[in-house]
Amino acid sequence: MDPAVTVIIPTYNWSSVLPYSIGSVLRQTFTELEVLVVGDGCTDDSEAVVGRIGDPRVKWINLPTNTGHQSEPNNEGLRQARGQFIAYLGHDDLWLPHHLSCLISALKQGADLAYGMTLYVTGGSDRYDRCLWPPCDYGPDFRIIPPTCVVHRRSVTDHIGGWRHYRELDWYPDLELWLRAYTANYRFACVPRLTAIKFPAVARRDVYKMRPSHEQAAWSQRIQNEDNFEIAELIRTIRAMAVQGRPQPIEFTKIASMAPYRVLLHDFLQETRKRLMRRGRRLISRPARSKGDATDAAPEPKGNVIDVAREFKGLPRMP
């Protein structure tokens, strides 16, 4: 019998984080799944690490060459997927145990693509050590939804195609994929639950040179051992965002008085979405410069946004 969900974990030469990301999948309350860990031409011990997990639902796949981005590993996962639903998980990210059950419930109610809230842990690389990221709809031309928090029907990518190579694009491949799904009139659903923890490599200079896993280990233990982790972490993070100087998303008195979870989350989503919508409109409606403007710069080559990110993370530019 085929699994209901195929979880695709793209990875490249960072084996120490894999037990934590894969472990967060195997602890899901929804268990009808397979896990495809797809190496982007890995040359380290990732295959051995995956093999030691010892769960028949977990399969290792390795591309013959390194392609430089998660797009091609994700496409290979799509080709080999047996599930009717597709989920993505960054190799250094974690899911809360209810992630799949919440998002699949939204799909069974009629959505084609569902996504939850993500906690971004920046590792103290700037003055904000963490922030909540409700996936944002800036309008039909700008949809920011981290792949780690997404589950979609397999039929979506069967119809519109998979991930495009980053060298074909001016922007991020995930944004382009969501835009294609949106313009093809697929139905998106935001589930108002914290379901994923993201450790963005673009917030950690040279992280691929060090390849640490201590953050994933610590957060994994907290998710497993803390009572009411989701609600407690929402409150802690909103407090931290207020103290650290981020725009206060809701009245602080509601946090201090431990308002009901649904009210707290609803207000946070509503207020944060308003701010991000305003920001998004500014991003997509900047006036075009007139020809000959002295501030004009040569257009960036396609894929440059990914090449710059690779260098920051400690990876070389692809040839």
Labelled PLM ranges:
Residues N13, V25, D40-D44, I53, ...:
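Conserved short acidic donor-positioning loop in nucleotide-sugar-dependent glycosyltransferases
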Residues P19-G23, E47, G83, L96-K108, ...:
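Short alpha-helix within the catalytic core of nucleotide-sugar-dependent glycosyltransferases
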Residues G23-E32:
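Short, acidic, metal-binding catalytic loop of nucleotide-sugar glycosyltransferases
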Residues G39-A48, T65-T67, G90, L96:
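A conserved acidic beta->alpha catalytic loop
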Residues P64-A81:
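Glycine-rich, basic loop-to-helix element that forms the pyrophosphate-binding segment
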Residues I86:
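Short aromatic/hydrophobic "clamp" motif used to bind/position activated sugar donors
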Residues L94, H98-Y128:
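Conserved donor NDP-sugar-binding/catalytic core segment of glycosyltransferases
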Residues P135-R222:
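Conserved nucleotide-sugar donor-binding catalytic segment
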